[in-house]
Amino acid sequence: MADKRDFYEILGVSKSATDAEIKKAYRQLAKKYHPDINKEDGAEAKFKEVQEAYEVLSDSQKRANYDQFGHAAFDQGAGGFGGGFSGGFDDFGDIFSSFFGGGGGGQRRNPNGPMKGQDRFMSMRIDFMEAVFGANKSVTLNVDEECTSCHGSGAHSKDDIKTCSRCGGTGQTVTQQRTPFGVFQSQATCPDCGGSGKTITKRCGECHGKGFNTKRVEVDIKIPAGIVTGQQLRVSGKGERGANGGPNGDLFIEIVVGTHKHFRREGNDIHINIPLSVIDATLGTEIEVPTVHGDVKLTIPAGTQPNTKFRLREKGVQDLRSGRMGDQYVEVKLEVPTKLSRQQREHLEALKETEVKGDSVFDRFKKAFK
């Protein structure tokens, strides 16, 4: 059997990584290799490898054991605990359980308790207007749902569920080895019951003993108005299957918002550039400006300069939390004609003649340097 890879190496973090760094690395890798997203060969194996690493490193006690003993802390038959004691402890199983996370006084952590399933991650691309006003979307997923026939037990009836004879219902087996250095003891999941502490004499005919059925379901996703790229939506119970009757994990959907041809969003404000002729900027005019809420009349005062910005109050995006509306900013971009008719040129030449009598714009500019 090939050696297992180092769990820290799998997640791409250092051995001094914080819980937050480990969780962040896991989420990124889980999204990258999830079988529902990544169809490449080997992706599913990598996904399982990432899950196994996170299961250990996200648990402070398991992580401490792993840091001290490596994979041997969880492999059956390995020397996970060095004793070297000649007496004073009658029950080495209790010592081992206490060392590996059980309570004191002979109380062990129940390995058969309900465990929530792993969360599932995916991304969803929506267009600009869907992010502004919200939308209703749907995704199709494979979801493990509790068998309605056996209610998750996997057995044909309650009488077909028996306490595992190998582990006595604990779900764990303990192996002891005596060496010249003392007693080495390890604990592993029971191979007969798979850690459940129960065995089934007759399986459920509906789910064939699994306790669940995999279904292809369509999940409705409500996109709230005002959402931005990077924000996540959570759908409860649509993640990976839980263990020992525990609930399913959750589905997290990271939103990616597309760009718009004309509008640009900054926070809850919308920005747009509008073309304006030199004549309209000089004499002033009234125009209808596109907004995400429809056209709005805007008065351009005479003498408007290039790149002037006008503010349209509450014509932006609704804030996701407070509900307040952002604004829209309209920036003027002057368009200088490249071709003129004879009549237009004559009018402009006449206008230029009136300017020559005084200082031109450029003349006033030069005087500022003297």
UniProtKB/Swiss-Prot annotation:
SUPFAM superfamilies: Chaperone J-domain, DnaJ/Hsp40 cysteine-rich domain, HSP40/DnaJ peptide-binding domain
An annotated Gene Ontology molecular function: unfolded protein binding
Main location: cytoplasm
Cofactor note: Binds 2 Zn(2+) ions per monomer.
Known cofactor(s): Zn(2+)
CXXCXGXG motif repeat intervals: 147-154, 164-171, 190-197, 204-211
Entry note about domains: The J domain is necessary and sufficient to stimulate DnaK ATPase activity. Zinc center 1 plays an important role in the autonomous, DnaK-independent chaperone activity of DnaJ. Zinc center 2 is essential for interaction with DnaK and for DnaJ activity.
Protein name: Chaperone protein DnaJ
Source organism: Erysipelothrix rhusiopathiae
